[in-house]
Amino acid sequence: MKCPFCNNISTNVKDSRSIEDDMLIRRRRVCPVCNSRFTTTEKLLLRSLMVIKKNGGLEQFDKKKLLSSILIATKKRPVSHDKINMMVNNIFYELEGKKDNAIPTDVIGKMVMDNLFKLDKVAYVRFASVYMNFKNINDFSNIIAKIINENNL
């Protein structure tokens, strides 16, 4: 790494630390020529995930949008932000592991529903009502009956 102070092309790493789920590395460096110290960060660049919308359009995957929809479903529920962030990261890493760069919205929605079902049934119903485009009270009754049947197994 080039020194930003004297432009020496070789610097020494004094300390390295992983942060943000080991996706970012912070390095403390020192220049042997001018003895200046500076910090660099290295971030793992992942491939660009695309989302195939229901209308056929393509959109860049947005982790914040995923988080926002889950936060809406879990609002005022006893679900910690740590668990929500872990869920978002797990879904993201699972999507990253798929061979396709373009993922249909229904695949992402199904992953969210599967995770919410395990985490909080009320949040699951809330998310399902939007994701599955509930039209009337019978749609709610059907999903609640499904939850009751799953719990009785």
Swiss-Prot record:
ZnF region ranges: unnamed: 3-34
Which superkingdom is the protein from? Bacteria
Q: How is the cofactor bound?
A: Binds 1 zinc ion.
Q: Which UniProt keywords apply?
A: ATP-binding, DNA-binding, Metal-binding, Nucleotide-binding, Repressor, Transcription, Transcription regulation, Zinc, Zinc-finger
The record's InterPro entries line, in alphabetical order, gives: ATP-cone_dom, NrdR-like_N, RNR_NrdR-like
Q: Name one GO molecular function term.
A: DNA binding
Provide the ATP-cone domain boundaries.
Answer: 49-139
Q: Does the keyword 4Fe-4S apply?
A: no
- Cofactor(s) listed: Zn(2+)
One family from Pfam that matches here is Zn_ribbon_NrdR
What processes does the entry annotate via GO biological process terms?
Answer: negative regulation of DNA-templated transcription
* UniProt entry tagged with the keyword Repressor: yes
Q: What job does the chain carry out?
A: Negatively regulates transcription of bacterial ribonucleotide reductase nrd genes and operons by binding to NrdR-boxes.
Q: What's the family?
A: Belongs to the NrdR family.
User: What name has this protein been given in UniProt?
Assistant: Transcriptional repressor NrdR
Q: Which organism is it from?
A: Ehrlichia ruminantium (strain Gardel)
